[in-house]
């Protein structure tokens, strides 16, 4: 029998057979012979002037409000950023009768390259390809303006969002021409996701830097095996590839592990082969999809000196520039001096920006170790949880 522990959080990871967790009733030490990490992802935070104004939502927050609470973000809306999720949420908001004025993406969506690539999506996965066409038709039928090769460069308002400025972009260069200005009440902005892989980092799994997002991915083979023995990783906690790849890789891992306890049957081998084919197909789908949504790399380019970079502790870009000096040349040193990254999110959002500013100041390369080091507890945890006697779980 499989024991399911709901609402249980892992706050410490010291070894694959030494994980610490808790829920409302118990404290646990988990000692696993095989560990599968599937901790998902979080949205990237690209700082933009006055992005702390009420009315500025992440795309994921807008989707959660709509799907979980049947509540659309209010008033006149613009969906902006980069990636297919933004197209999806724009269509979902329109179906919910929301007033979406424009869908803005930093990719050049209507390039000649994309005209040839788009039909490939339908060939690789007809179901997902048709779903994407449906989203696009929803925008066209509602006469929502589609603006490509553009980014939000400023949010404007007194105590709440009133306007958004949209500028053209190419090769990380923001156009100096007069930006488009929209009168809005809400903005959903999203520039993709970063893997939530703190457990894998603490366990010493090999990492690979994503040079576009400056987020680390967990190195793994085709079936999700990491560099650490008996540690596996699936889903967006490994790299951002979507639900279908998580599903099929999870199936491959399950079959692999079951084969260690019993002799594999013909049906197991057939199921493994089918899952491997589907995984390969969806990996190809993602590769083509992100070629279509390929956009200039953005980290701190949309912020000015007064922009808040660390939202948890209200640290501005100017504060960071002031303290990045000849003897403060690492993310850890900046963290200790400015407290950026010491808030509840533990640097998940500001770490890439701190790395970028250090790199620009010193001309130093960014690698897998440039960001903030993972710490225990992984996320804010009550001290009573850490001090309370533990109930051991062997799994």
PLM regions: where:
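Residues forming the flavin
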Residues: 1-344, 348-395
């Amino acid at each position: 029998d499989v024991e399911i522990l709901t609402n249980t959080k892992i706050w410490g990871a010291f070894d694959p057979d030494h994980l610490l967790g808790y829920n409302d009733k118990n404290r646990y030490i988990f000692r696993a012979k095989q560990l599968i990490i599937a901790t998902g992802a979080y949205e990237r935070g690209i700082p933009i002037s006055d992005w702390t104004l009420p009315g500025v939502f992440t795309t994921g927050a807008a989707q959660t409000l709509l799907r979980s609470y049947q509540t659309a973000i209010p008033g006149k809306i613009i969906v902006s950023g980069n990636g297919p999720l933004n197209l999806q949420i724009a269509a979902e908001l329109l179906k919910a009768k929301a007033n979406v004025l424009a869908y803005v993406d930093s990719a050049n969506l209507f390039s000649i390259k994309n005209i040839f690539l788009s039909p490939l999506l339908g060939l690789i996965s007809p179901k997902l390809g048709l779903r994407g066409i449906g989203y696009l038709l929803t925008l066209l039928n509602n006469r929502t303006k589609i603006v490509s090769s553009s980014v939000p460069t400023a949010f404007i308002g007194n105590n709440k969002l009133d306007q958004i400025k949209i500028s053209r972009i190419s090769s990380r260069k923001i156009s100096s021409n007069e930006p488009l200005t929209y009168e809005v009440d809400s903005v959903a902005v999203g520039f993709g996701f970063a893997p939530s892989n703190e457990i894998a980092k603490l366990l010493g799994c090999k990492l690979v830097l994503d040079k576009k997002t400056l987020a680390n991915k967990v190195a793994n083979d085709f079936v999700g095996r990491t560099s650490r023995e008996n540690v596996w990783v699936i889903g967006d906690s490994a790299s951002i590839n979507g639900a279908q790849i998580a599903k099929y890789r999870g199936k491959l891992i399950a079959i692999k592990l079951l084969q260690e306890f019993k002799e594999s049957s013909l049906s197991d081998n057939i199921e493994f082969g089918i899952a491997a084919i589907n995984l390969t197909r969806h990996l190809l789908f993602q590769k083509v999809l992100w070629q279509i949504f390929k956009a200039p790399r953005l980290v701190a380019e949309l912020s000015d000196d007064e922009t808040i970079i660390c939202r948890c502790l209200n640290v501005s870009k100017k504060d960071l520039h002031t303290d990045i000096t000849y003897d403060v040349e690492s993310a850890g040193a900046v963290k200790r001096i400015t407290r950026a990254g010491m808030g509840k999110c533990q640097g998940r959002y500001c770490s890439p920006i701190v790395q970028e500013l250090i790199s620009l100041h010193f001309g130093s390369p960014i690698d897998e170790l440039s960001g903030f080091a993972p710490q225990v507890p992984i996320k804010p945890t009550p001290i009573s949880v850490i001090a309370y006697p533990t109930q051991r779980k062997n799994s």
